[in-house]
């Protein structure tokens, strides 16, 4: 990911304030509600029949935290995302057969949740930097597919 020094500093500063459990659960939950076809990868999560069921589902929240923790690893290794996400890319491609477009969708949902969580502190400039980051992470996760 090509960020200027001030962009990288701003991304890292905001990330240090992110509650991985709260933001991760919200982001994954929204992905499953807004793009319901993504639910097919989460059959073992139980009731995903309504938005309220998805957003209140403890397995969604727990997996969302796990996803956001991995995303945070990427935030701290922006210069080496392909290596950082190599194993996850292989898992999602070879074993789980996840459509790589879902990584882009989740990244965009994450940006929405960050904007919601941080309000005015999530400036247009910071959003632009995070859009670069989520695009880079999505590309790294899709790398095994190429």
From Swiss-Prot:
Tell me the keywords, alphabetical order.
Answer: Acetylation, Heme, Iron, Metal-binding, Methylation, Oxygen transport, Phosphoprotein, Transport
UniProt-listed Pfam families: Globin
| Sites bearing Phosphothreonine, chain numbering | 123
- Tissue occurrence: Red blood cells.
Q: Name one GO biological process term.
A: hydrogen peroxide catabolic process
Q: What residue range is the signal peptide?
A: none
**Where N-acetylvaline occurs, residue numbers?**
1
Q: Does the keyword Phosphoprotein apply?
A: yes
Q: Which residues carry this modification: Asymmetric dimethylarginine?
A: 104
Assembly and partners are described as: Heterotetramer of two alpha chains and two beta chains.
Q: What does this protein do?
A: Involved in oxygen transport from the lung to the various peripheral tissues.
Q: Which family does it belong to?
A: Belongs to the globin family.
Full protein name: Hemoglobin subunit beta-2
Q: Which organism is it from?
A: Tapirus terrestris
């Amino acid at each position: 990911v090509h960020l200027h020094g001030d962009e990288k500093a701003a991304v890292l500063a905001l990330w240090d304030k992110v509650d991985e459990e709260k933001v991760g659960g919200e982001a994954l939950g929204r992905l499953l509600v807004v793009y319901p076809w993504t639910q097919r990868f989460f059959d073992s999560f139980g009731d995903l029949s309504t938005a309220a069921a998805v957003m209140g589902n403890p397995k969604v929240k727990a997996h969302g935290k796990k996803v956001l923790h991995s995303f945070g690893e990427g935030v701290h290794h922006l210069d080496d995302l392909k290596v950082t996400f190599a194993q996850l890319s292989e898992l999602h491609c070879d074993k789980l057969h996840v459509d790589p477009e879902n990584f882009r969708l989740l990244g965009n949902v994450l940006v929405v949740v960050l904007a919601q969580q941080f309000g005015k502190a999530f400036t247009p400039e910071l959003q632009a930097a995070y859009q670069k980051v989520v695009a880079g992470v999505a590309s790294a996760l899709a790398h095994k597919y190429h």
